[in-house]
Amino acid sequence: QQILKSLENVDLDKELPGVQVCVIEQQDRVEALFNERYPEGLKPEDVVYHAQTAEELLMINYTSGTTSEPKGVMIPQRAIWSNMAFAKEVLPQLGGGQKVLSMLPTAHLYGMSFELLYEFIVGIHITLLNRALSPALILKALSSIKPDLVVVVPMLIEKIVRKGILPKYNSPVIKVLRKIPGVRNIVLGKFRDGLMQALGGNLYEVIIGGAGLNSEVEQVLKDIKFPYTVGYGM
């Protein structure tokens, strides 16, 4: 077994921030190292916590982004803090004991922020899909897990709406029924309930992002009063 002896700041490159290097020692030297550092024993004043600042580097996110050229993106504390504050503001109903199905890559800050970090902070149970994603696999997982929150890219919602809703929604009979006061709300409610069931039946909200949502599909979601938020372009 090994333990951490010390942390030392090492300047690897004058253009890069200092890097802390861990020095490792064997377990049998633990007591000697402890006594060397704290000859009078560990006191409360010896415990010093690092004071974080908003501009401090939190992570280097290695991604291709929109340029297709892989690069390391330096993400400060501020970027993640602001996203977590935003999530708390717009998703106040979510909390401990609820469930989310994580499908987006965590190398992307959209997936990391709203499918992993926020859920971890408020105590939501996270189920990760570790297989190649397909609409059939995703729908099966949604039916089994019945998540409270779904965060997806537009492609999934667009496929479900186009294949499962639009053919009936745009049929001559339904078009007539949608124009009749009183009947319209009942018909639209049936479509909303069907889409909710396809996504697990237990949804608080669906967050759609990563790309633009098709305007025809979005209009249907608005008409049936489906609980969704478009996060693309924030």
Regions found by a protein language model. Give the residues of each.
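Conserved AMP-binding/adenylation subdomain of ANL enzymes
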Residues: 81-99, 106-193, 202, 223, ...
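Conserved S/T- and glycine-rich ATP-binding loop of Class I adenylate-forming
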Residues: 57, 63-66, 100, 150, ...
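Conserved A3 ("GATE") glycine/threonine-rich loop of ANL adenylate-forming enzymes
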Residues: 155, 209-217, 229-234
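Conserved AMP-binding A3 loop
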Residues: 58-84
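Alpha-helix/helix-capping structural signal
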Residues: 2, 78, 155-158, 211-212
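Structural core segment of the AMP-binding/adenylate-forming
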Residues: 1-34
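Conserved pre-ATP/AMP-binding loop-to-beta segment of ANL
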Residues: 28-32, 38-62, 69, 93-99
